[in-house]
Amino acid sequence: MAAVATLNAQTQTVQATLAGGADNEHLCVSVGQPFFQQKTLGDYEFSMGVAQAQWTRDTVYDVITYNTPYTENGFDLPAQTTTHKDSAYLVNGGIYNYDLLRTLYLIVCPEKVTDAFSSGIEYDVLAVTGHCWTKQNLRSPMSDAMSYTCAMYPTVPENYGLLYTWNTAINGTVADNDGYVKGICPNDKWHLPNAEEVDALISNPIVALRSENDWFGPEINTNATDFTAFPAGCYNASSSRFEGLYTQTDWWTMIDPGSGGGSTHKTSLELPCHCYTTLLVTRDPNDAISVRCVMKNEWPE
């Protein structure tokens, strides 16, 4: 079986061109670094180890990197410098025909990304349902960024981030040629979440998105996705008060609120407590809520 691949570290994109000869569960690809092991069936053979994958239509593969020597495959692999983390492998295509030459495009989430306004702030990155997200809420030091001001319940910026009005979150940016809006996100590869990305995220159970700790309510949160949504609350502009700490969290989105929301209102994604469903909320743009960012899925031409 013929197989070639290239790794572009700058774009974090792996392109593997695969030829026939594989069966329905196994296909070998040599791509060098890093080493991945997939958590489902089948095998990819990498120069530094074996990564397993199951071939299905438009599949997203969640993989794990290792930071300790891994020798179960007999390759006696060296220790990796990265920590254990999930990444996304996105297959751009339909059902694979193994007797035909096909191209497999893979996107790997970076481990961290640096804040756009402070080089001293970094955010972890994780893959959730086919997209790379910042694992923490942004805490960019904007002049009008807010922190929850309840003396009884001080928040932890590293966990809860800061709260931003719509105009601050957008930061004067407009949609690029691909329709993405960067806002205060780390760099031009990152943007505020759109409808497709939000839909993919909330296809997960709400308990799998919420942090295991800090939430009021009877639900048992699993944080199975590692998204770690802390209940950061919000600032309500109409009442000029902070509310919702430990009971809800919201993020600005680029979802059109529709005619019912009014021309100035914007849409947030809300995770409430005492509830097993996520909400899309039409908000006053002067409200201040959290911001998370998503990385573009850029496929080669």
Regions found by a protein language model. Give the residues of each.
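Conserved positions within compact, well-structured domain cores
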Residues: P110-E301
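Residue-level hotspots within well-ordered secondary structure
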Residues: Q10-Q54
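Short, surface-exposed beta-strand/turn "edge" patches of beta-sheet domains
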Residues: V31-L41, D86-G93, T267-P285
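Proline- and Ser/Thr-rich low-complexity, intrinsically disordered segments
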Residues: L7-T11, G42, S47-C109
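A generic alpha-helix preference that emphasizes hydrophobic side chains
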Residues: T6, A22-D23, T71, A224, ...
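Bacterial N-terminal signal peptides
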Residues: M1-V4
